[in-house]
Amino acid sequence: MFIVFSSFEDQADSTSPSFISKKYALEELMTANHRVSDLFNAAKAHDSVGVIQKFKEARIQYKKVEFYLESYESDFTKFINGPPFKAVEFVGGGVDAQKPHGFQVIEELIFDEASPNYDRIMDECFFINKEFIRFINIIEVNPTSDASIFLGLKYGLIRIEALSIPAFDCPITLQVAEEISSSLESINKVIGFYADAYESKPTYTTIKATQKQIKEAQHYLEPSAGHFLDFESLDKLFFIKKHLQPINANIVDIFESIRVETPVLVRLFRYITHINRDAKNIYDPNFLDNMATAEKSYYSINKDEKLSPDVIALGKKLFNDNRLSNKNLMSCKTCHDPKLAFADGLPKAITNQEGMFQQRNAPTIVYAAYQGRLFT
């Protein structure tokens, strides 16, 4: 359906692990593009058995490159394998509900109807192919770095833990084990490129230990290993604690070692993201970029400016000042008490009129600080 030619041209050192990782990602993305074309052809032929098989193959292949795409353009991936619901975007001061696209939409078209909706499946395949080609072109013309590669690895592990294990991104097929194993295979491959580059460095030992951990995690997911029979019997908490968390912790250690061993990369590692890359698992209290302690914050409106002690002190003063209200009776703290997780603990929020209440409660502003970035 689509033919893509690539020369893998880049100004970076063609022997560097970041360049080799980029080349590998392009190859896997092109393969994913072909798998989607195979699905398109099966739908065009009204092959009900082939559509199911080609769909599963296409998404498993996509999982090999998903982590890399996340590090480039996270908004891109939600239109490839995001939930089959309209995405709310804030555009020009208004709200725009965008139509969902991607693998999960196809999943519903195949399994949630009496018979596959072949025309719509073909439309979705066309959309995915078009987006893959767009992204191939973006990757080819943009240089990469160790910083972006390791950010992608971290994103990949987060996606496994938050989306793949609970089957959030494969809710009907429930092919959790196969898709996680595919993601881990790709992560292991990329880490291997760094093993080759750092063979004479202390980092090498940690890299090889991480590769061993990944292989053990993949083995756990193999049906022949006998650890589970189906999605329901998969011990998800055990898999997270025994396998994913140690892998994630080692990725952070490797990341730090490369930063130390290669001083020129220090500046590249400091660009702002919405997660704390030093957090070793998603349950770390500082997993999200902490605007109270960070020099700069992804979640701050002025994220390009340093959060100085004076700015923080001013914010606290304004937060507690009743004089900013209409009748000098209320402050932000009135409805968002720090002692109550910045909520009010009431069924319905109070107003500045005695005995009158709002139609709803006052939600914690901790969530409000993250909402615009996390849920759009």
What are these regions (language model features)?
Residues M1-S14:
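Bacterial Sec-dependent N-terminal signal peptides
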Residues Q11-M291:
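Mature extracytoplasmic or organellar-lumen-exposed domains after removal of signal/transit peptides
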Residues L29-M30, E305-P309, M356:
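Short helix-capping and inter-helix turn/linker motifs at the boundaries of alpha-helical repeat units
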Residues Y62-Y72, S325-N326, K339-A343, G372:
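Amphipathic alpha-helical interaction segments
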Residues I180, I240, S308, S325-N328, ...:
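Active-site-proximal structural scaffolding
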